[in-house]
Amino acid sequence: MAKKIVAVIKLALQAGKANPAPPVGPALGQHGVNIMAFCKEYNAKTQDKAGFVIPVEISVFEDRSFTFITKTPPASVLITKAAGIEKGSGDSAKGQVGTINRAQLEEIAKTKLPDLNCSNIESAMRVIEGTARNMGVSVKD
């Protein structure tokens, strides 16, 4: 029989830099999970993606064991890296803060495709383009 899931915890952590300090410690500690075991596994799995924030979904079982699934970095983080900017525009209607080209847009869409609710690359590109536009980043051909 499969183990019963007691909780599902969602966190967004720096790749390769998880430590027992908040937010990891309190979130896992209240469910009785071995915090250091999670930190070591997460850091080992994400060390090649340094510099990105990687969302993680942790399933905690009734025997206090856990499994976790890492997601792709948020689209906004990928767009800001591609455009070479610190952050998006506060008011996207008035100010453009950067530009990305179609090739960069397609690369981001390919990266995000497993986590998006899309079946093909064209619709994924439209989703990412909308996110970029809302951040004040224009897409050039």
UniProtKB/Swiss-Prot annotation:
<dbReference type="Pfam" id="PF03946">
    <property type="entry name" value="Ribosomal_L11_N"/>
</dbReference>
<dbReference type="GO" id="GO:0006412">
    <property type="term" value="P:translation"/>
</dbReference>
<keyword id="KW-0689">Ribosomal protein</keyword>
<keyword id="KW-0488">Methylation</keyword>
<comment type="function">
    <text>Forms part of the ribosomal stalk which helps the ribosome interact with GTP-bound translation factors.</text>
</comment>
<keyword id="KW-0687">Ribonucleoprotein</keyword>
<dbReference type="InterPro" id="IPR006519">
    <property type="entry name" value="Ribosomal_uL11_bac-typ"/>
</dbReference>
<dbReference type="InterPro" id="IPR020785">
    <property type="entry name" value="Ribosomal_uL11_CS"/>
</dbReference>
<dbReference type="GO" id="GO:0022625">
    <property type="term" value="C:cytosolic large ribosomal subunit"/>
</dbReference>
<dbReference type="InterPro" id="IPR000911">
    <property type="entry name" value="Ribosomal_uL11"/>
</dbReference>
<dbReference type="InterPro" id="IPR020783">
    <property type="entry name" value="Ribosomal_uL11_C"/>
</dbReference>
<comment type="subunit">
    <text>Part of the ribosomal stalk of the 50S ribosomal subunit. Interacts with L10 and the large rRNA to form the base of the stalk. L10 forms an elongated spine to which L12 dimers bind in a sequential fashion forming a multimeric L10(L12)X complex.</text>
</comment>
<comment type="similarity">
    <text>Belongs to the universal ribosomal protein uL11 family.</text>
</comment>
<dbReference type="GO" id="GO:0070180">
    <property type="term" value="F:large ribosomal subunit rRNA binding"/>
</dbReference>
<protein>
    <recommendedName>
        <fullName>Large ribosomal subunit protein uL11</fullName>
    </recommendedName>
</protein>
<dbReference type="GO" id="GO:0003735">
    <property type="term" value="F:structural constituent of ribosome"/>
</dbReference>
<keyword id="KW-0694">RNA-binding</keyword>
<dbReference type="InterPro" id="IPR020784">
    <property type="entry name" value="Ribosomal_uL11_N"/>
</dbReference>
<dbReference type="Pfam" id="PF00298">
    <property type="entry name" value="Ribosomal_L11"/>
</dbReference>
<dbReference type="InterPro" id="IPR036796">
    <property type="entry name" value="Ribosomal_uL11_N_sf"/>
</dbReference>
<keyword id="KW-0699">rRNA-binding</keyword>
<dbReference type="InterPro" id="IPR036769">
    <property type="entry name" value="Ribosomal_uL11_C_sf"/>
</dbReference>
